[in-house]
């Protein structure tokens, strides 16, 4: 238990991680309808978006990378929903396997885009991934 309770913790993150989080929050703003949940989503989105606007100079390259990241995260959202439906129906056949593989490949692409954002912005923090080759 924290003795000094804080309502938020400030942590430095890479620019790619910030873009990723904001893109996911934008998707949540569109997908989630529960008003109480939406309030928390909007509050977090506004806080993070303000940091992005205040700390980064917008340009076409970064905007394109953000859009690509959001597109990947949107696809992941749909695939995760479909995979949960397979789980609910105990359907672990070809569709489930394809969805699982799609998540794997999209997450690799997502990591690549985040690294490119970090490189483009000179982010001092970079998320480094290493996986078994396939």
What do the PLM-derived regions correspond to, one by one?
Residues 1-5:
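Short, Lys/Arg-enriched N-terminal segments with co-localized hydrophobic residues
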Residues 6-134:
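Anionic, Ser/Thr-rich low-complexity intrinsically disordered regions
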């Amino acid at each position: 238990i924290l003795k000094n309770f804080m309502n938020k913790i400030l942590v430095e993150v890479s620019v790619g991680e910030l873009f990723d989080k904001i893109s996911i929050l934008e998707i949540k703003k569109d997908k989630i309808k529960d008003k109480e949940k939406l309030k928390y989503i909007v509050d977090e989105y506004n806080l993070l978006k303000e940091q992005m606007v205040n700390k980064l100079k917008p340009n076409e390259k970064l905007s394109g990378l953000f859009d690509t990241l959001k597109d990947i995260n949107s696809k992941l959202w749909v695939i995760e929903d479909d995979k949960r439906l397979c789980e609910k129906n105990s359907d672990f056949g070809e569709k489930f396997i394809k969805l699982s593989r799609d998540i794997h490949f999209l997450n690799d692409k997502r990591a690549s885009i985040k690294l490119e954002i970090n490189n483009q912005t000179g982010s001092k923090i970079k998320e480094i991934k290493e996986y078994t080759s396939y």
